[in-house]
Swiss-Prot record:
It is found in: Cytoplasm. This is Transcription termination/antitermination protein NusA. GO terms for biological process: DNA-templated transcription termination; transcription antitermination. Keywords: Cytoplasm, RNA-binding, Transcription, Transcription antitermination, Transcription regulation, Transcription termination. The keyword Transcription applies.
Length: 540
């Protein structure tokens, strides 16, 4: 038999190696794809119906043969694509007999022109199919799992706009489309991020693994990782809804009555929930107490706004709809920025429609509603913290004790320590003001008598002039006016020391229209501002 072998060229050898490394495939798999592509190209485009391709990668040899069945010369009906008369076959191999198989060598030179492009296209198709099978076997059971991976490249369109990100998964590549990003989020090449393996596409010419950072399972993973009480099963996440990058609502329940689920998820000074929020570009995360009763669950989900009343629509078409009545100054908070908050509430609680009215609007439209006669869940620590402030003699602003300040289950409100810190800062500012005011009478008196300022020491027989209000305690002693015997002390109208400080809490309290609004304070704290939660739609 006259065999002809084609030696590999160095570029072809290198091509096989590169494809194997890039697609994370074995050399034998790549060789098999090449053999299949060559054989199909010969059969389809050169009418070489029965072709066999043999490749020895280690020796760098390739053998392509066309196979013919040997038939008797008297057979006039033979198929010249598959069969060859004995006389013709013996010219190529004298040892053949009828019924044998002739192997006729084929040269690679027969593949030329546009056939090369078609063969390469077919080869790439076979490579992708093989790579997909490998990926499927490795990742099919990982769908829904969270992985940490590095962003390798950015995929852009013709105009340079973002299409998505190419992510290195070590054994293969993953792809995250732009739609799977959180709102306003941008990823950096070379940096590691957390991703959810969202799906594996069966038909993909590039990256079959689709990744996501907007999937709710990523939020669930972070809550579980950062909250030991969730990890050990004490707190259970019942349901969650997300508007990625803007706001989320998470319904939870505690299996231990001693464990407050909201406080546990917030963590000390809100550190736990703050870290999770930063992972999603500052996304607001509301923690809601789950309740099997849909009405009570809805009232919990509306917090920190108050549901005054409700009307469940019983007609057949909207049997799961409800109308709720809230105070006029809270209706904007219930809707939220672009209606995001009310959509999350509706989806979370399972009501097909939640219509919101003020009492005035409900009356004008003739809506009869039932008053809410139960206490919503999710106001953790309110009584304890309110009493701390209202019973503290240092704080004269009674508006601090209103429910409006702490009536919330929002994740950006922290625990008692923040309230104590605010009180300390208020006291420090007040002491500073009193010190400044207390020195004014002495300086004015010295100017009247043309006396030099004297050190602050106690006089033997102090006779201070009567004050409108007593000086506060724990303040450095202020010397009384100097007594002069030769002539009477001129009467000086002393300014009243300021006793009532400007409340640092005025930034978080919305005063009623009938009351005087407290003055704004310049005090700065690290505590998230409740007013922003209520009034700033961009933060909802």
């Amino acid at each position: 038999m006259n065999n002809q072998s084609n030696h590999f060229t160095n570029p072809l050898l290198q091509l096989i190696k590169n494809v194997a490394e890039t697609k994370n495939l074995a050399i034998d798999d790549v060789v098999l794809c090449l053999k299949t592509a060559l054989a199909q190209t010969y059969k389809k485009h050169l009418n070489y119906v029965n072709v066999e391709v043999n490749i020895d990668f280690n020796k760098g040899l390739m053998q392509i043969e066309q196979l013919f069945d040997v038939v008797d010369d008297n057979n006039e009906d033979y198929d010249d694509f598959l069969e060859m008369p004995l006389s013709e076959a013996k010219k190529l191999n004298p040892n053949l007999e009828v019924g044998g198989v002739l192997r006729k060598p084929v040269s690679l030179k027969d593949i030329k022109g546009d056939l090369i492009s078609k063969m390469v296209l077919l080869f790439n198709q076979k490579i992708n199919e093989t790579a997909f099978k490998t990926v499927m076997s490795d990742f099919i059971n990982e769908v829904g799992q969270v992985i940490e991976a590095r962003v390798e490249d950015i995929d852009t369109n013709k105009d340079g706009g973002l299409k998505g990100y190419i992510v290195n998964l070590e054994t293969t590549k993953g792809y995250m489309p732009k739609r799977e990003l959180s709102k306003g989020e941008k990823l950096d090449i070379g940096k590691k991020y957390l991703f959810v393996i969202k799906e594996i596409q069966k038909q993909s010419s590039m990256w079959p693994i689709t990744l996501s950072r907007s999937d709710s399972r990523l939020l669930e993973f972070l809550l579980n990782s950062n909250t030991p009480e969730i990890a050990n099963g004490t707190i259970e996440i019942k349901k969650m809804e997300r508007s990625p990058g803007t706001k989320s609502k998470v319904a939870v329940i505690s299996k231990d009555p001693v464990v407050d689920p909201i406080a546990a998820i917030l963590g000390p000074k809100g550190e736990r929930i703050r870290g999770i929020s930063e992972e999603f570009n500052g996304e607001i995360i509301d923690i809601v107490i789950w309740n099997e009763d849909k009405l009570k669950f809805l009232v919990n989900a509306v917090l920190p706004a108050e549901v005054v009343g409700y009307n469940i629509l019983q007609d057949d078409e909207r049997d799961t709809s409800i109308e709720i009545v809230v105070p006029a100054n809270q209706i904007a908070n219930v809707f939220g920025f672009k209606g995001i908050n009310i959509r999350l509430i509706s989806n979370l609680t399972g009501w097909s429609s939640v219509d919101v009215y003020t009492e005035k609007d409900a009356a004008e439209q003739g809506i009869e509603f039932t008053r809410v006669n139960f206490q919503p869940q999710g106001i953790f620590g309110i009584k304890k913290r309110r009493d701390k402030i209202s019973n503290n003699p240092r704080n004269n602003n009674q508006q601090l004790a209103s429910d409006k300040v702490f009536y919330t289950s929002k994740a950006n409100v922290v625990d008692d320590e923040i309230i104590v810190d605010l009180a300390k800062q208020a006291e420090a500012k007040r002491v500073k003001q009193i010190k400044q005011e207390a020195t004014k009478p002495e300086l004015q008196l010295q100017q009247e008598l043309n006396l030099e300022a004297t050190p602050k020491v106690a006089a033997p027989t102090p006779t201070p002039a009567p004050q409108p209000t007593p000086a506060p305690t724990k303040v450095e002693p202020v010397p009384p006016p100097v007594s002069v015997t030769p002539k009477p002390i001129p009467k000086v109208n002393k300014p009243k020391p300021v006793v009532k400080p400007k409340s640092v809490f005025s930034i978080t309290v919305e005063a009623d229209d009938s009351k005087t609004k407290p003055e704004k304070s310049s005090a700065k704290t690290n505590t998230p501002q409740t007013k922003q939660t209520f009034d700033n739609f961009d933060d909802l």
